[in-house]
Amino acid sequence: MSFMDQIPGGGNYPKLPVECLPNFPIQPSLTFRGRNDSHKLKNFISEIMLNMSMISWPNDASRIVYCRRHLLNPAAQWANDFVQEQGILEITFDTFIQGLYQHFYKPPDINKIFNAITQLSEAKLGIERLNQRFRKIWDRMPPDFMTEKAAIMTYTRLLTKETYNIVRMHKPETLKDAMEEAYQTTALTERFFPGFELDADGDTIIGATTHLQEEYDSDYDSEDNLTQNRYVHTVRTRRSYNKPMSNHRNRRNNNASREECIKNRLCFYCKKEGHRLNECRARKAVLTDLELESKDQQTLFIKTLPIVHYIAIPEMDNTAEKTIKIQNTKVKTLFDSGSPTSFIRRDIVELLKYEIYETPPLRFRGFVATKSAVTSEAVTIDLKINDLQITLAAYILDNMDYQLLIGNPILRRYPKILHTVLNTRESPDSLKPKTYRSETVNNVRTYSAGNRGNPRNIKLSFAPTILEATDPKSAGNRGNPRNTKLSLAPTILEATDPKSAGNRGDSRTKTLSLATTTPAAIDPLTTLDNPGSTQSTFAQFPIPEEASILEEDGKYSNVVSTIQSVEPNATDHSNKDTFCTLPVWLQQKYREIIRNDLPPRPADINNIPVKHDIEIKPGARLPRLQPYHVTEKNEQEINKIVQKLLDNKFIVPSKSPCSSPVVLVPKKDGTFRLCVDYRTLNKATISDPFPLPRIDNLLSRIGNAQIFTTLDLHSGYHQIPMEPKDRYKTAFVTPSGKYEYTVMPFGLVNAPSTFARYMADTFRDLRFVNVYLDDILIFSESPEEHWKHLDTVLERLKNENLIVKKKKCKFASEETEFLGYSIGIQKIAPLQHKCAAIRDFPTPKTVKQAQRFLGMINYYRRFIPNCSKIAQPIQLFICDKSQWTEKQDKAIEKLKAALCNSPVLVPFNNKANYRLTTDASKDGIGAVLEEVDNKNKLVGVVGYFSKSLESAQKNYPAGELELLGIIKALHHFRYMLHGKHFTLRTDHISLLSLQNKNEPARRVQRWLDDLATYDFTLEYLAGPKNVVADAISRAIYTITPETSRPIDTESWKSYYKSDPLCSAVLIHMKELTQHNVTPEDMSAFRSYQKKLELSETFRKNYSLEDEMIYYQDRLVVPIKQQNAVMRLYHDHTLFGGHFGVTVTLAKISPIYYWPKLQHSIIQYIRTCVQCQLIKSHRPRLHGLLQPLPIAEGRWLDISMDFVTGLPPTSNNLNMILVVVDRFSKRAHFIATRKTLDATQLIDLLFRYIFSYHGFPRTITSDRDVRMTADKYQELTKRLGIKSTMSSANHPQTDGQSERTIQTLNRLLRAYVSTNIQNWHVYLPQIEFVYNSTPTRTLGKSPFEIDLGYLPNTPAIKSDDEVNARSFTAVELAKHLKALTIQTKEQLEHAQIEMETNNNQRRKPLLLNIGDHVLVHRDAYFKKGAYMKVQQIYVGPFRVVKKINDNAYELDLNSHKKKHRVINVQFLKSLYTVQTRTQRINQSAPLRELREHTKLLHS
């Protein structure tokens, strides 16, 4: 078989020479099927061209054959046909590729591309993933569709505001430049935020802790005997400052060097002539934007962090001074290893003409300074000391004794500097170790950790000592340090502490060994932002007031400070070695497994019984991914980490078919962590869930422990081997190679389960150990017991070859940290620095920020009484049920205050006595578990519990609600109380007899069964005594209805002077000589004065009667009383009703006036909270409007309907009968019951309607069973009343009643929302408000249309204003006749206008008798099962009668109670061809019953 015959779908090619048949293997990943995917087509062509460019081809035919071998059907079939038609020896390779492209290329959908781009953002994805996805999507864009500038604009809109500002400042010319600038900016921010300082090289900003890492990488920091504690400041500043600081010189000199700018007199920033850097407008504009953007960001604060002093020169002085030359200028320089950074004086900067660049404000204070200073400018300096070339960055100061100060970062990076400077300054004798005479210092103050403000008298005796130190630079490797001997003093302190002797006056002498606790070095900075919250980390170490130490040469060295204050309970970063406090036999026995470094993978690691395996789901694909794009700098970091892993034998080079990419994640200390992206592998892995222990359960086991040890395994995952057969699955790729793990890596989905199971199996039988992954807590009640416990645990770790990280452990202490808690003797408390983080958490602005805050709070919720109740407003905001208001702000403050007030809980002790107190209310349930002694006195609180109620639970009776609270509390504390006797206290006495109840409800019976599993004594606690649980569960909210007193117009006179209009009118009338108009109203006052002088019409409108100002017979309302008037006519329970703008304006405008009256009402109603709560959007009506005939007179045509869904009253009233006169719109609201039948309905009509208004001609209603009853129909016939009923499912026929019911429902919500059980009491008031309110159609109230006058209202306290009118009989008849004519005209006009407006966009449906139609399923049938998949229309049915243009009677089954008249909105014409029409006529139409059954039972 020839080569061409082996090609799938081929075999018909002409015979080729041997040189045309290449022997290159097919790459499976490089294939194309031809699925009209333009992106894949482009990638395929690019890849195939790239591969072919590396091979020498004899002719185009061989290239075509090679390309054809990578095509799959249908692309392969196309290639066969194309080559067969053209001839393989006749066509060129370019023609083949062009034909492939033209055949399978499909123009991309621009809208889809843009939609995909709008889904991206830096905030969601991060800058690396954003760049990757944006480039992938953008490559699908047609080449000439958008310019490069438009591409940059599209990309930058996806960045965060901070990144966008920096990228804009760089002014990128290409999309690639913009993406690179954004990546570099964000990488710097993520790496060094929140702390940073100037790098010693002066080109970048680095984290303050970056300097520490260089020293922590070596072994000498673990030798605490030689460690001196130094402190360096970090400045945490606004995020916006972190971005623009990267490499100032390089960034500003992209096109021109510094020398070229100086030579050509160019600006260092914009590279233009005519100005200097400090005059550059472009630079000022950018800095101004950044400054404004950062004003609302986080404020500056200074925080102390410990570092380790460079111990290779421990015998040298801390400072040295020397004059050095910079640019041939002598500069007086101070070398100070105690300074956290470098400084330079401003006059030297100006003399040397250094370029100044902006920095975040640095706040500092020296040794003896009483005030702090701030600087925000820095320069980069190049200098040479002997043969050492140094580049450093220094802050600029206006006043300083020295011209240049070189600080600790440079001296640590270049340790030879101090050697060089000191050797030229002092004789060799001066470099000898200084010794101290044995002296005594009196009157020394000591601050203990627990009581900083209590001084103690201590005598100090000093004597020299010799200590052994480890010099890391002299060690050949990490495991073979070289010992050197250094002289240090002092070492022994004899302390006399009168306080420890009690009040007897005798003293006890304490000896403190400084071999294990070295005094902190002098710190040049003082904590400024929170000085009162710090305390000593070294208990009982002396701080002399004016102490001095006598040196050999007779000089005194002033001691300024010997203790550095740090945050209380903060993590001890000084690596204080507590391992040496253990007994010597323990230290010697376990020194091999307690270390700071992780030794290489032992050869016998495979002997460990636990191995991690990876089981793949059937049919799942393993990852085969390319490495991510990384910068050159990040690639170097990756290579360093990979090399270290190779040296430790944790990874080996791999030839695995799998590959996962890697990413670098910055740590807090400035270093990086290598993370493998195993997401694809994890999706294909069968999960192996293993439950982690509950933290509450772990803490409950501590009991009466007095001494604690915490252990932290050193890279615990890397101490578990991989199953050899599964190692290839862990393969990862870097830009330089592929590797696979021999140990369990981080990031695998089942890695936590494997490790947790391993640790649980190792320590399952030990009750004095708590294990949570690699965190181990050992607790004991005495030191002797603790040594045994510690020996047991360490022995097991040693047997399992598990290494413990020494500097992360804390041995044999009375207080320690474990899983975010501070644990001590009879104490469990939250960590203070965690509480400080919560306290400093900014007010959330988004849902995610609120969720993040609640997540932090929920971890410590056991310390917060009433936590769920306090957090409820925040939860409502997260659920989008509330806006962020003052309630949420108060909840935030309450939660912060509750957590930051040092809450302390006592650990659970199985031998102690406990008392559970519960309470419940309609708002929630709460409980508190307390420990009590034998006399029932409180020892401490073990924990709090609170929970909100669900809507159904709020309806439980009081007894069941209390029982529910008990059950929930017992379930919460079950792990402590189950199987133990305790006291259960409740303030609901009915619970005491629940267990004796004969036949309780099923729910209660189930709860009682749960109670039976506990051993408790039920105790009644009177409500006033149940303070704690009551506070947790109860919160009282009262809402009072809006009321207002009658308006006293006489009081308005006192406001005339301050009102601009009234004062202008009175001054013009010479009734007032001076005014009190406020400055903000002066412009309006002058405008009114001008109008009064120039316009006679304007003047005539105003008059003065009884010292009251009138505008056209309407009272003028001062500004300060306008809200009172609007409140009366809008909010009042009797005169208001919370109507809209039109109605409220109609109420106010006939009586009162002020400028912009309508605008004021609009604004008032728009901001009315009650209106926003109760009013709903009124949807547009559908279908043609066929109005009813206009009513001829009062109460001749009425409509009626029922309002249901009301809560039953004390009289069992639960429905309202609404009767409306269609002429005057007057209504009666009659309270009744749902059980009302036709006979009772007739009785109500006689008692409330017919007896007052006579018998109507027509009654319009819906098809309620009461109206369709035989008795009702017989009555209306005998009385000559025509009963008009709406068609099925079309309540719009009785539109008058429906509209009235809408208004009635809104009034009910406004009046009775706080007292829903008594709605019938408010019904007469609501009826009066409704009938006295003018309607929009008629312009008058129903009262006036019906009676001819307005009823008197007591809203106005004035004898002159009377609303009710007095008529004679003749006048009343004339007035009523005029009203009747006017009302008819207005009704006709409104009807025509309404019909025109509603029918503009409607199309009538005209049917003839005999036509066939389809009926919508909602017209007759109730919703059944699976309605989403049922047909929308049923039928066809035949039209048998036309009622009007809007309703037709259909040929439906007559046995149904519902009417066969259907509104046209539920009908649809059936369009058929002739043959189908004949078939329909020949057979009977589908019947209603069959369709009903099909819908309900399908």
Swiss-Prot record:
The active site is at 336 (for protease activity). The protease is a homodimer, whose active site consists of two apposed aspartic acid residues. This is Transposon Ty3-I Gag-Pol polyprotein. Integrase core domain contains the D-x(n)-D-x(35)-E motif, named for the phylogenetically conserved glutamic acid and aspartic acid residues and the invariant 35 amino acid spacing between the second and third acidic residues. Each acidic residue of the D,D(35)E motif is independently essential for the 3'-processing and strand transfer activities of purified integrase protein. The record marks 207-208, 233-234, 309-310, 442-443, 561-562, 1037-1038, 1063-1064 as: Cleavage. Residues 1185-1350 form the Integrase catalytic domain. GO terms for cellular component: cytoplasm; nucleus. It comes from Saccharomyces cerevisiae (strain ATCC 204508 / S288c). Residues 646-823 form the Reverse transcriptase domain. Keywords: Aspartyl protease, ATP-binding, Cytoplasm, DNA integration, DNA recombination, DNA-binding, DNA-directed DNA polymerase, Endonuclease, Hydrolase, Magnesium, Metal-binding, Multifunctional enzyme, Nuclease, Nucleotide-binding, Nucleotidyltransferase, Nucleus, Protease, RNA-binding, RNA-directed DNA polymerase, Transferase, Transposable element, Viral release from host cell, Virion maturation, Zinc, Zinc-finger. Residues 470-490 are annotated as: Disordered. Initially, virus-like particles (VLPs) are composed of the structural unprocessed proteins Gag and Gag-Pol, and also contain the host initiator methionine tRNA (tRNA(i)-Met) which serves as a primer for minus-strand DNA synthesis, and a dimer of genomic Ty RNA. Processing of the polyproteins occurs within the particle and proceeds by an ordered pathway, called maturation. Residues 919-1037 form the RNase H Ty3/gyspy-type domain. Gene3D superfamilies: 1.10.340.70, 3.30.70.270, Acid Proteases, HIV Type 1 Reverse Transcriptase, subunit A, domain 1, Ribonuclease H-like superfamily/Ribonuclease H. The keyword 4Fe-4S does not apply.
